Amino acid sequence: MPSTKPPKERPYGKSKIRCLRCGTREAVIRKYGLYLCRRCFREVAPQLGFKKYY
């Protein structure tokens, strides 16, 4: 098997934004400065005061 290079670090863009809790780069919610992925957001939403997720 050929060896593969790690992905190039980007100085800006979607690949730079990470979830503060788990570190994933997929589905990050940036609104209100949350910077959480949707999965982490669902877990901590009640503590943050989002009533829809009680």
Curated annotation (Swiss-Prot):
Residues holding Zn(2+): C19, C22, C37, C40
One Pfam family recorded for the sequence: Ribosomal_S14
Keyword entries, A-Z: Metal-binding, Ribonucleoprotein, Ribosomal protein, RNA-binding, rRNA-binding, Zinc
Cofactor: how and how many bound: Binds 1 zinc ion per subunit.
Disulfide linkage: none
Transmembrane segments: none
Gene Ontology terms, MF aspect: rRNA binding; structural constituent of ribosome; zinc ion binding
InterPro entries linked to this entry: Ribosomal_uS14 (IPR001209), Ribosomal_uS14_arc (IPR023676), Ribosomal_uS14_CS (IPR018271), RIbosomal_uS14_euk_arc (IPR039744), Ribosomal_uS14_sf (IPR043140)
Key word Ribonucleoprotein present: yes
Aminoacyl-tRNA synthetase as UniProt keyword: no
One cellular component (GO) term of this entry: cytosolic small ribosomal subunit
Gene Ontology biological-process annotations: cytoplasmic translation
Top-level division of the source organism's lineage: Archaea
Cofactor: Zn(2+)
PROSITE patterns with a match to the protein in the record: RIBOSOMAL_S14
Function: Binds 16S rRNA, required for the assembly of 30S particles.
Complex and partners: Part of the 30S ribosomal subunit.
Family as reported in the entry's similarity comment: Belongs to the universal ribosomal protein uS14 family. Zinc-binding uS14 subfamily.
Protein name: Small ribosomal subunit protein uS14
Organism, scientific name: Pyrobaculum aerophilum (strain ATCC 51768 / DSM 7523 / JCM 9630 / CIP 104966 / NBRC 100827 / IM2)
